[in-house]
C-alpha cells in the first residue's frame, strides 16, 4: 500500500522528491519506508523528520518533511558506524568482563572506541572481537532508545553499569541537560544521543583494523586507554571492495612514496609532526607556491611576511588563546632585562598578524578591498595518535590570505575567492569537488564569537555567494569556525576518498576585536568585513593528498625531474651531454644517466622514479640529431629533433596539463 490511514488524526508527509503522502498520526519511519517499497524498508537505517535524524521507530505526529536514511548516504554511514562502535563495545564486554568504555564515535572511515581494560589487546583479540560482533549481529537484537532524567542516568551508570566514564560525561559535559538518552541492546547499554540502527542484525561484515593508545578526553594528564578502530558494512561484498581500496591506498600512501621518491622526511630528532622537505619535495612545493603567487598577483593580492612567534596577548585579543589552547604548544615564558615576564606562542594562526598590518595605517573606503597574502608557517600541538605524515602535522604552511572589504563588496569578494579555489583544483586535476557550507549551531551560541544577528548576516552572505557561483552544496550545522561561517571544499581523489582542502571564511568578529576600520564616503569610521581564504589549505596537507591522488605520477610541470637522458652506449655520451645541456638551458629539470648499465635497466629505474620523459639516445639518434621519446607509463612516442622535443616539453610544462 502507498499510504497508511485509520481513524486516528492524519499527517501529511512530504518526501524528498516533493510528493506528499497521507498517514495516520504516529506513523513510524519504518512504516513510511515499507509503504514506499520493500527494498527501501530493508535498506532503511533511520530517517529524518524536518532534517533531524531519528530512529526508525520514532512516531511522526505532525505534518513533516521525511527522508529515509540508508547506508548509501554519509548520514547513513555515520549512523551505521556509530551503532557498530556500540556493537564492538558489547562484544568486548562479553569477552572481557570489567572493561569500561570512554568515547566511541563514528569517524570518516568507520569508528573507534576508547577502552579501559587491564588486558592489553592484540591482533588475536581483534579477530575474536570480530567473531563475537558477528555472533551478536546474528542474534538480531533490537536496539532500543530510553530517555531518562540525567540524575537517574547517573545512578544507572554508577550502580548498574558501574562505568565511571559515562558518569563523568553526565556530571560534566551534560551537566545542564535535564534529560538524556540511553540505548539498550540486550544486556548492553550506552549513553548516546542517537539515532541508531533498529537492530544489530543490520551489520553483516566486520573488520577491526588497528589498536592504539589514547588519553581519556584527550588530556595527557588523565588515564591512558586503548583505542580500537574498525569498520563495518551491510554486506560482505562491500567489505571486499573496501579491502581492495585499502590495498590501493597502501600503494599510494604518501609516506611510502615520499620516502621512495625523496620528497620529505620525518625524524624524532627534529620532532613528531615536523616534516623536512627534501630537494625533490621542495621543488614540488616551490612550483605550487610560484603558481599560486602568480595567479594571486593577477587578482590583486599583495604579499606580506610575519614572524613564527607572537606575544600571547595578541592571541588572547583574537580569541585563538585560550579557544585553541588544547591544540597549541605551551607558551614560551621568559623575563626581559628589567625582570618583566613575557609570554610568546608559536604562531597558531596568521590572521592576527594580518589584522595588525591592516590597522597600521588609516584606510579609506576607496582603498578597499585590500587583499593580503602569505605562505605563513603555523604550529599546532596535534595529539601524537592523530599525526599522519604531511596530511596531519604539527608544523605546516598555509597559503593564507585575508581580504578586507566593505559590506557592499563582500559577496563579490567571496565569489572571487571561490573562483580562485576552483581554478586551483581544476589545474591540479581534482575534478570531483564537494562544497559544504559550514554554519554555526544556534543552540550552542556561546561556542562562537559575535552575536546571533552578526552570524545571521554572515551566513546569508555566504549562501548568496555560493548560489551566485552555481555551487551545489550541503549544510554542515556546527562546522563553522568560532569567528564565522565558511565554505569548505572537499575533493575526491583518484580512488574515491574525500579530503577537505581549501576554505573560504567570512568574519565579522575579528574586525570588532581588533577595532579595524576605514573612513567611509560620509567621513565616518566603518567596520570592514574580513574574508579568510586558503585554496590549498596547507601546503603539507595539499601535497600529501596530491601524492596519493597521482600515486606520485606528477604532471610534467610539477615533477621534480622532468626528463632523463639515457644514452645506450659510451660512444654517444658526448651527444647525450649536448642534449642534456640544451634541455637544462631551456629550464627543463633534467638528469643525465651515463652509467654503463643496459638501457632496459636504465628505463626501468626511470619508470620507478616516475620521471615523465625518458630520452633514449643511440647511434641512430646521434646521426640524425634526434632523440627517442619514451613517456612514463605510456611507452615509446617516436623520435623527435632536439629543438622540436624541447618545444613540446616546454609547451606541456607551461600549460600545466
Curated annotation (Swiss-Prot):
Cysteines paired by S-S bonds: none
GO biological process per UniProt: threonyl-tRNA aminoacylation
EC numbers: 6.1.1.3
Cofactor note: Binds 1 zinc ion per subunit.
TGS domain residues: 7-70
Residue span of region Catalytic: 253-555
Descriptive protein name: Threonine--tRNA ligase
Species this protein is from: Chlorobaculum tepidum (strain ATCC 49652 / DSM 12025 / NBRC 103806 / TLS) (Chlorobium tepidum)
